[in-house]
């Protein structure tokens, strides 16, 4: 065989090998995305009742995550317990307006700090266009308005804050408050659920009748005192132990609104939780240079309780963290990735931008103002180099904190570029 034929054969073999390697890589990526999506589906299922504190939903999800970290090949998995006080709504959740039944999570939600209520109540509507504070409180003092529920619009709470607070207190004889939500989809929160106020407070959709006369309700709440939950921490040992990388995501969500309505939280934040499990699996199979820690936090939607606890009780000194990645809501289809970066993390962010520009993982990285909106915050406050990655404003984002944040409205599109950006960064940082 001549030299030219040998060279041609060698070239052809190289091409074939490259094609085969590319096909294997594509297959592995497809399997990775499939495994990732399967975990998102599991975590957002009814089994975990919205990963809240009623029905022990969050802790059940935590046990599932612990097992997934173990299956991923982590060298060590531990649970870090902590306690919180939290208001929940696990029982009756019935509300009718002028005899018409409203649907929890769609037509109405509870403020997270609201007590329950039972009975039929007259409605007193506040006219914010022709606002007269003295007249309102004089009207509410009349015998015929005793124990009425006050109805106002969403912006009343901002425009007339002092009066709004007065309506919440026993100083005013109204039985409770109802106010209309401004967006098409009702949201639910847990951030201020560590207390219970004196009167029931209900959010209703913009379709709530402006001329409604009365409401009938049977709503139960349960305040959990010193409820024990836990962070799940997995470790993959590296070649060096003087520094480490940390990957975080919160696995808790909003829980339930009565016995039948739950908040699945596929995008927020089953998506981020599943992602750090796949990252643990990746580094367990590819021994890293530095130790890797993967922390699934509970209590985030209860205002960063789990991450704050960990930051105060770290299992390795915070000074050893080389870089921390917080993944919160990465299950969307926006080609632009939102992020927030701590001051010590800016050098790393510049490298991330460079890698993103070279490889086109995302159209761009849109850096916003650093804020206390997710689990990176307690670390940023303590001088840790960190970044918060969130895929917001895509088609899934409209369902944020609603009962419609389901596996069906979740998109895995942003998962793979996020995974590649992170692993590429760690290889070069």
Describe the function of each predicted region.
Residues 32-48, 53, 64-72, 76, ...:
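Catalytic-core environment of secreted peptidases
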Residues 115-134, 183-264, 281, 285, ...:
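Soluble metallo-hydrolase cores and metallopeptidase-like ectodomains found primarily
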Residues 46-56, 81-83, 153-157, 220-222, ...:
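Second-shell loop/turn segments in exported
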Residues 1-32:
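Bacterial Sec-dependent N-terminal signal peptides
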Residues 281, 396-429:
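His/Asp/Glu-rich mid-to-C-terminal helical/loop segments that flank catalytic regions of hydrolases
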Residues 288, 297-397:
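Metal-dependent peptidase/peptidase-like ectodomains
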Residues 32-56, 72, 78, 92-97, ...:
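N-terminal capping segment at the start of a domain
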Residues 49-161:
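Noncatalytic luminal/extracellular "stalk/propeptide" segments of secretory-pathway proteins
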């Amino acid at each position: 065989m001549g030299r030219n034929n040998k060279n041609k054969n060698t070239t052809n073999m190289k091409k074939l090998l490259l094609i085969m390697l590319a096909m294997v890589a594509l297959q592995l990526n497809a399997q990775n995305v499939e495994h990732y999506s399967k975990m998102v589906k599991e975590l957002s299922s009814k089994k975990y009742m919205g990963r809240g504190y009623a029905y022990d939903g969050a802790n059940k999800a935590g046990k599932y995550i612990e097992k997934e970290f173990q299956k991923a090949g982590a060298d060590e998995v531990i649970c870090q317990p902590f306690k919180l006080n939290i208001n929940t709504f696990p029982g009756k959740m019935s509300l009718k307006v002028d005899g018409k039944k409203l649907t929890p999570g769609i037509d109405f939600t509870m403020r997270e700090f609201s007590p329950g209520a039972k009975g039929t109540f007259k409605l007193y509507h506040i006219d914010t266009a022709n606002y007269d504070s003295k007249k309102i409180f004089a009207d509410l003092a009349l015998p015929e308005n005793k124990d009425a529920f006050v109805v106002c619009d969403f912006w009343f709470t901002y425009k007339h804050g002092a009066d709004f607070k007065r309506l919440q207190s026993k100083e005013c004889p109204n039985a409770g408050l109802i106010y209309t939500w401004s967006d098409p989809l009702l949201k639910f929160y847990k951030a201020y659920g560590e207390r219970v106020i004196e009167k029931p407070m209900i959010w209703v959709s913009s379709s709530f009748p402006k001329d409604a006369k009365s409401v009938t309700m049977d709503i139960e709440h349960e305040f959990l005192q010193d409820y024990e939950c836990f962070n799940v921490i997995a470790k993959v040992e590296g070649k060096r132990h003087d520094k480490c990388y940390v990957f975080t995501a919160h696995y808790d969500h909003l829980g339930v609104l009565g016995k039948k309505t739950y908040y699945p939280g596929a995008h927020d934040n089953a998506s981020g939780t599943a992602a750090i499990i796949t990252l643990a699996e990746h580094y367990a199979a590819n021994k890293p240079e530095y130790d890797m820690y993967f922390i699934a936090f509970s209590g985030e939607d209860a205002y960063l309780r789990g991450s704050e606890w960990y930051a105060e009780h770290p299992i390795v000194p915070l000074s050893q963290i080389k870089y921390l990645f917080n993944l919160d809501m990465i299950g969307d289809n926006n080609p632009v990735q939102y992020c927030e970066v701590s001051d010590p993390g800016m050098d790393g962010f510049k490298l991330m931008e460079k890698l993103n520009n070279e490889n086109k993982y995302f159209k761009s990285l849109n850096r916003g103002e650093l804020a206390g909106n997710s689990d990176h915050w307690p670390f940023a406050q303590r001088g840790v180099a960190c970044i918060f990655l969130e895929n917001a404003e895509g088609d899934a984002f409209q369902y944020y904190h609603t009962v419609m944040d389901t596996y069906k409205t979740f998109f895995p599109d942003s998962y793979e570029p996020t995974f590649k950006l992170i692993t590429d960064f760690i290889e070069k940082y």
